[in-house]
Amino acid sequence: MDFCAGWGGAAVAAAALNIPKYVGIEINHDLKEPYQRLSAFLKNKGTTTEIDMRFQDALTVDYSTLQYDLVFTSTPYYFIQKYKNNREYEGGKKEMDDQFYKPLFRKTYEHLQKGGHYILNVNQEVYERVCIELLGSANDIYTYKKSKRQNEYQEMVYVWRK
């Protein structure tokens, strides 16, 4: 389950591995038609993955109706990335922590199946300000270097086992 689906990288990865079902949640309704094309393309290539996309605010989803044993997502990094249809947090990082990250992480972790994995690609500040308080220290931490052009810049992927 990917509650900040973005441009579809995780959907493609799930399809490449023939994961039985990928549930993506994306607030940007403009991506609905591109996702339909992507799903058709992946089916045409032979994937057996069912891609279930929901175009809505991730905070409004009733996660108790979904069955998932894996969360793998990359959330917005405070105000570094601007996404269409995302609300603005006039109160700064604390407001975004309290009104976006904390309720979203709480809801999605609560309904993760026991024994499942909760995997977040977030910046270190979100990890330290929000994740440790809600989820405790990650069981595993991996470096995720996105590009060779960015030299020493690297992000982290944090993994919790429920």
What role is predicted for each listed range?
Residues 1-162:
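Class I S-adenosyl-L-methionine-dependent methyltransferase catalytic core
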